[in-house]
Amino acid sequence: MIHNCYFQFLFFVIEYIYIMSALCGCKKNRRIIMKKFLSLALALIMALAMFAGCAQQGAENAAEEPAAAEAPAEVPAEQPAEEAAAATVFPLTVKDQLGNEVTLEHAAERIVSGYYISSSTCIALGLKDKLVATEEKIDKRPIYKLAAPELIGKVGNVGSAKAFDLEACIAAEPDLVILPKKAKDYAATLAEMGIPAIVVNPESHEKLVEMVNLIAQLTGAEEKAKALTARYDEVMKKVEGLTANIADADKPTVYMCGTSSYLTTAPKDMYQASIVTSAGGKNAGDSLEGDSWTDISYEQLIAMNPDVIIIPTNNMANGQPDFTADEVMSDEQLKEVAAVKNGAVYNMPTGFEAWDSPVPSGVLGMLWMTAKLHPEVYTMEEFAADAADFYKTFYGFDMDTSSILGETVEKAA
């Protein structure tokens, strides 16, 4: 189009020059006129070429501008694709907490949990509708009555870690089985049968978070897991801040009992030991090796001479272990132990969960222990409010804090 304009214009100029030279008669004058008009014509052609080039560049820029203007509008459209890329893609192969490789073809829809801790985790992750079988005696555990009453009497029973019911597990037709370390041999058996099974062993805060994320990844509950682990981090930072300025000399030695006997305690690598140290205490059993409840003698307990003795709940309906605080206080062999002499033998609250165990609510154990050991930095009233908010957020029920606050009122009286 532009080239045609050039030729038409040039033809017009030459024709114009010819006519003018003819009118001028004299050959000399015609040559002079011809030179002037040719110079003028060339100047005009160059000007027109420059104008056309600018016009063409402007048109190209104008054509590009809408695309540039539209680019920001494409960003939101790309975001879902990025989010989808970040989500778990199946088939998925993971390693469980014992290092076993497990592959799932799709997100689990039918879950068998043979471990109370993983069952509670599934409830906290919003997966209770996917539980088709659980550990035994769920009707005796308060958390089921409070947060998942619809499971009681409606789902299968696969026994305990010590007596796992393989047949009941298979009958539930699961596409994911979650087992504790004590039942690890059954995981291998299930794998041979083509049933994906993972083994979990959350014996530290880090391992607890790892377990939560592992279960979430296999079930499509990543968003819930993100919120839950964020709360863990929040509580950990809170406790760390509360106890940061407590001098080592002001940190009491704390003896954590087992639920079967007060001559059973938590060694240094057990989850319960981390609760004590996080809350500004010293674990009396830190000289003991291992990550499970360890039996000791009277002589060992007397030598530990703890300032505080804590008796955890047993996770069942009455929440009481196989002995009472009064039994500990009245044991003649312990009368010289500091905790007994000073009446510092305490039961953890009952009616909810064992906050000394690595369940999702285990972080509440750190807060409770902080309030018990250092009420000057964190009160039991503050703990009750934090605990109620946790259960409402992740388990969906309103917590009755009267048993916690009742203890405080009774002590004050």
Where are these regions (language model features)?
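Bacterial N-terminal signal peptides
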Residues: 43-49
